[in-house]
Amino acid sequence: MAIFFRGGGASMSYQQIRIVLKNDLSEITKLHGELENFGQKCSLSSKTLFELNLILEEVLANVISYAYRDNRRHEIVVRADLGDGELVIEVEDDGRPFNPLQIPPPDLDRPLRERNVGGLGLHLVRELTSSIEYSRREEKNHLVMRKKAEKSEPRQRWT
C-alpha cells in the first residue's frame, strides 16, 4: 500500500489522500487506519468518517472479489478530496468493465426468501452518497462518488 497526502498550504489541513492498494481483501483493513488519519487532519465528524469507511469497504470488496479474472497482482487507486463541505471519492481499477449504475436497486419490499442475492452493498453506497458517476477510460473503471462532509465539533476547553 502506498499513501500520498496533499494539503492546501502550511496553515491548512490535508485535503486530499491518494492510496494505492493491492487486490487483496486484507488491504481494506489497512485502508481504515489511513482514512482515520485523513479524517483527523481534515476534522471530519465521526459519522462522516464511518460512512466514508463503509462506502470504500463495500466498493473495494466488490472490486477485489469480482473484477479480476486472474490471480496476478493488480493496483486499485483510491482518492478522497475534501473541498467546500463535500468529499469526492474516486476508485480506479483495471478489472473487467463493470458499471454499477446499471444494477437495479434491490426490491426491499419483497420477502427475504424471494429476493435476489447481492446488491445490498451497492444499495448502501447509493444511500450514503449524493451522487455516483461511472466511466471506463484507458482500460480502467473509474467510480466517482460525492458525499456531504460534516466537520467534527470543536472540543471545549475548560479553564
Annotate each PLM feature.
Residues D81-I89:
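Short beta-strand-loop-beta element adjacent to the nucleotide/active-site pocket used for signaling
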Residues E90-V117:
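Glycine-rich/acidic phosphate-handling loop/turn and adjacent ATP-lid/helix
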Residues A2-I19, R126-T159:
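Flexible, glycine-/charge-rich segments associated with ATP-binding catalytic modules
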Residues L35-E57, E114-N116:
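Conserved short strand/loop->alpha-helix "switch" segment adjacent to the catalytic nucleotide/phosphoryl-transfer site
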Residues E114-T129:
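Glycine-rich phosphate-binding loop
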Residues V63-Y68:
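Short helix-loop "hinge" at the ATP-lid/N-box region of the Bergerat-fold HATPase_c
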Residues R73-D81:
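A conserved short beta-strand within the histidine kinase catalytic ATPase domain
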Residues Y14-S46:
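Helix-loop-beta hinge of the Bergerat
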